[in-house]
Amino acid sequence: MEQAFQAAIEIGIPIVNCGPGGKSEDEATWPKVIDSLGNLAHMAEKYGVTLCVKAHVGASIYNTPTTLRAMKEITSPAFGIDMDPSHIHRAGENPVEAISAVIARVKHVHIRDCKGRGPSPGEPYMQANGRGDIDLVGYIGALHEGGYDGPLDLEIIGTKGKGTSFEQCCVIAAESRGHMQACLQACGAR
């Protein structure tokens, strides 16, 4: 990760995201995960970048309570949260309520929709903003009301090996961007 921080600072990237590691509900490995993320956050601080981690289905940090716990235990100002509503939704939570609870440390946001609460976000075309079950207008509105002005990163996964062409990926991206722009306008952020 040190090389990633060095490269980030050299090319002007202020935020480096990583996964939390560990497994959900595994208290035995929680201290190791927190120590590792804490050490990485201190290293990021040394380089003048922010390390962000997101709640991820199946990982040690996977929902709002575990995100809040990590926020409490990792005190470095270089530690931030990358929020992805699809993981919070699949953890059985309301992403609008979740973002409001952790907004103080949110430094990066992935935006992806999903249908259902399965372990997967679903087929790529169902991840396009507005096609799934997530209240993205409410989510982006909560970000705006909370004062968030950082990056919103559109994300679609699972296209490899499923026959999704480059052109289809571009259509999904364009649809998602258009929906996100409409959400930003609806909540007064644009």
Residue ranges and their predicted role:
Residues G12, T64-F79, M83, H89-R190:
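Histidine-acidic metal/acid-base catalytic patches
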Residues M1-I81, R90-G92, Q168, R190:
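Active-site acidic/histidine proton-transfer and metal-coordination neighborhood
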